[in-house]
């Protein structure tokens, strides 16, 4: 039998493509070497959000006295881990049931290419023919093959790196007194904020002068201040040269400038992730790659005509003239930011977010089997950092907007205030958690090119504003909209130039 589509990888993008294609009456096979759901379900979005929720519950309980509650509480981490993992197992089973319901053939094992139409699966069990028992190898043939293998943690060549764990293994921790995280991206920041609120002494090590360097500086300043107030230790200019194991659950972190930090139960490395493509044998087919990422065009097609890729394992190459300089932020190519003219050379970009992979997978299936033409739109994708307090952001930072459009063409509206929720807290005003928000406007019409917020419920607030920015909302549009009171979000609709 020849499949219409073979999907390698059962994460968000692969599942979305497989199920959508099957609903278009395509004959589909999906290959997965581990648990269904990929990074998001198993070691990413879902368990992370549950831990974020636990940390948020901690904050409410700890401060409930300000609302008149006399609350004494204790925390049972092993119990939370057990309930979290049971929920994830339930999701794994739901994913399996959904594939069966949509008549997608599931194969368990590691896939590699034999040719552009054939793959070899090792260590498999065909779940649709269980009477056959376990199979050592299986060869599948498909007219189209989609690679959706996701990514995996990166471990740099640091002495003693074998003594560390990745963000994936963080979810296995059931007890710890002191944890150090090496890295300053969104995964590191989200985890360190959770760790502290679970009663664990916390250190985060950043190579540069601040965390989350690609985000708006004003927003990150607010976050860093809150983290320091909550006794999270931020170590900057931290060039780690060794992780030394002194004894069991006693690790020390050594920096190049001689600084030493000691007595860590766990050290977690969060310095990036790379595509999980090493077992695919792409070199047999001369599939184009860039820094190990599979290169695809805007239709998700690789350099081999019938092979596609979606999600965290690929990068989109845009080689035609780029007229919308606002897109440049997405390309992670800072050298382009100071260019005012159109850019014509090849640019590669990748947005590693679950909804992006799902969207790309579904639209690919629509193009392949319904002959539709819609492509994933990478412009103005909203992003949330589940820190404490959370951050919501859309579009350009103030710094990027000035570099692209010039300072004279950029107008900033911002406000910083205490959310009403914290108004009754019986503490000094400067200790109350602040909400900070900003609009980045460009041109005489004040087109909103960036929207940023940090504060309580920012993660829920930002979604609706993403629609407005996609529809080219201006500051005038915001001004003419009647706000909901009392809310934090209403501040976006009432901002004035003098507000600071």
UniProtKB/Swiss-Prot annotation:
One GO term of the biological process aspect: cell redox homeostasis
Listed name of the protein: Glutathione reductase
UniProt KW keywords: Cytoplasm, Disulfide bond, FAD, Flavoprotein, NADP, Oxidoreductase, Redox-active center
Positions bound to glutathione: 12, 19, 95, 362
Protein role: Catalyzes the reduction of glutathione disulfide (GSSG) to reduced glutathione (GSH). Constitutes the major mechanism to maintain a high GSH:GSSG ratio in the cytosol.
KW Cell cycle (keyword) present: no
Gene3D superfamilies in alphabetical order: 3.30.390.30, FAD/NAD(P)-binding domain
GO MF term set: flavin adenine dinucleotide binding; glutathione-disulfide reductase (NADPH) activity
UniProt cofactor note: Binds 1 FAD per subunit.
Other comment: There are 2 isoforms resulting from alternative translation initiation. The displayed sequence is likely to represent the shorter isoform.
Predominant cellular place of this UniProt entry's protein: cytoplasm
Residue numbers annotated as active site: 485 (proton acceptor)
EC code(s) of this entry: 1.8.1.7
pH effects: Optimum pH is 6.8.
Subunit structure: Homodimer.
Thermal behaviour (record text): Inactive at 80 degrees Celsius.
Disulfide bridge partners, by residue number: 40-45
